[in-house]
Amino acid sequence: MAFKIASSPHVTRNLHTSTVMQRVILCLLPGLVVQCAFFGWGTLVQVLLAILVALSCEAAVMKLRNRNIKASLSDNSAMLTAILIGVAIPPLAPWWMIVMGTAFAIVIVKHLYGGLGHNLFNPAMAAYVLLLVSFPVQMTTWIAPSTVALHSPSLVESLQLIFNIGAHVNMEQFRLGIDGMTMATPLDTLKTDLSMGLTTTESLTKAIFDGSTGVGWFWVNLAYLAGGLVLLKLKAIRWHISTGVLLGLFVASSIGFLLSPDTQASPLMHLFSGATMLAAFFIATDPVTAATSPRGRIIFGALIGVLVYIIRTKGGYPDAFAFAVLLANLCAPFIDYYVRPRTYGHSTS
């Protein structure tokens, strides 16, 4: 009788890629539902359109590469990328933008570098940056949350606006839900007000803010935080990167707020505005484009958090996670090289 000799642990549980992706997608659903509740049906339409484009592009590329189409589609990676792009862009953005961004993410960013497990950059964030740089007006046009808007677009109106059909529906109907409210996000509004000489306290009196956070965005971030905690409980991701992102952003924003409270947003505003929780738990934790060692993951996450604060306060794009994640992706190989775990019985050198 032959015995297989192997080191512990002897009982392991291997999660397939498709299982991990399914868990991530399921944990995204609470945030998606809350986002749709505040910003209308457009978000759901964008997500469904992105999924259709992503699966089509994935199948086409696999066909050209003579690979197994069914296996590639069933790993759910393309679907996850599509959902992340769909929730990141404004809900009423034109249909061709989500098509362009999703196709770019799947064909160029993912498969041009070799496919799943070989891409250097996060596909969803690379697509977001492409759209933001190419079409800044459309990518910064968010409607007012339903709780403060006089009229929120219905499903039919959302479809008409996204696909540009129906002459009686236009974006102007949702531009000013309440007096003085533009179609900018709370982070955009705060940055614009500060550049005009207003203090943080004066800016926060506007109706788009609810105390120290943006209307609707606090609950959206809270929903993504809840989904992220479930994701940690399911062990689909590790805690290092998410903790690093939130700690890096919290420490940097706390220092800035303590030094200049009149010209800086509070740490609570930074943590629960924009895509903070979505990025911390669902984007930055992409194992392909992140650092690999435990210490390296913490450094990687902290780098993202600090970069987000710097870009939000000094740069031109208040919700800076896409740029921060891509810059950290570039640094991941260097972090892995210089922060290598010590092998037992060997020196660190």
Curated annotation (Swiss-Prot):
EC top class, as a word: translocase
Transmembrane segments annotated in the record for this chain: 20-42, 77-99, 124-144, 212-232, 239-259, 265-285, 291-311, 315-335
InterPro entries registered for this protein in UniProt: NqrB/RnfD (IPR004338), RnfD_bac (IPR011303)
Cellular component, GO annotation: plasma membrane
Membrane protein topology class: Multi-pass membrane protein
Family, per entry: Belongs to the NqrB/RnfD family.
UniProt protein name: Ion-translocating oxidoreductase complex subunit D
Organism: Shewanella baltica (strain OS185)
